[in-house]
Amino acid sequence: MNQTLIKAILLLIAFTLSCHTPLFSQRDFERHEFSFHAGYGVMFHHPPTLTLSTHSYQRTLAQGESWDGQYNFRPLKRFVFGGIYSGFSSKGSHPEGKDHLWVHFIGTQIGMCNVNTKHWQIRVTTGPGGVILRNNSEVFGKTRKVKAFTIGLLTNANLTYKLNPNLGVSLGVQYMYSELLRMRTHYHGERVIVKLDGNNDTNLTRINFTTGLSYYF
């Protein structure tokens, strides 16, 4: 191979690199994002598995604390996918007993960054996942535990203000839809599987309002 051909190949490589380098340097977003939020959650229907069925008690237990942790990967400026954990907890008591309700959602998310500027980001994602319900309750001094697992769909919207390229503060709204098909109860030494008929008392649908931090890298 003569020197002229070698020089031509080297020039071609140099030209190719000079064309591609600006394209990569124009990426003005970080590919990875971790975010953590906490706030308020409310169920649209009466929570299932409670030890008291009065309307006021059911509405009290339908409201509680919510929190979530999210990871998102952005291969393109507006396209994003990742995973999410979302939790909910509420508790109450009455003369005959008490309830401590937990609802956990673990699933995948896919969506879009509808707005992405130097300081602002709006991200909307949705996806399916598993829903775990637990009620650590007590009736007449005896422990009663209820467990259930089902499938749900969670839609998540976040508005983030970026303090710097790596850190932001955000507001979030989450809507989770899910219904129970059956549950397992353990009370007074007996274990029972209860099949549910799909009325409002089996609906776990809720909305969360949260605030937190996002870290980009």
What is the predicted function of each stretch?
Residues 1-31:
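Cleavable N-terminal export/targeting peptides
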Residues 24-76, 80-81, 208-217:
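Short glycine/proline- and aromatic-enriched beta-strand/turn motifs that initiate or cap beta-hairpins
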Residues 27, 54-60, 95-99, 142-146, ...:
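Outer-membrane beta-barrel domain signature
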Residues 40, 126-128, 173:
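A structural signal for short, well-ordered beta-strand segments
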Residues 45-51, 90-96, 133-139, 179-185, ...:
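Outer-membrane beta-barrel proteins
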Residues 70-141, 145-151, 161-167, 204-217:
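Gram-negative (and chloroplast) outer-membrane scaffold detector with strong preference
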Residues 154-156:
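Outer-membrane beta-barrel porins/channels
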Residues 158-217:
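Predominantly the C-terminal beta-signal and adjacent terminal strand-loop region
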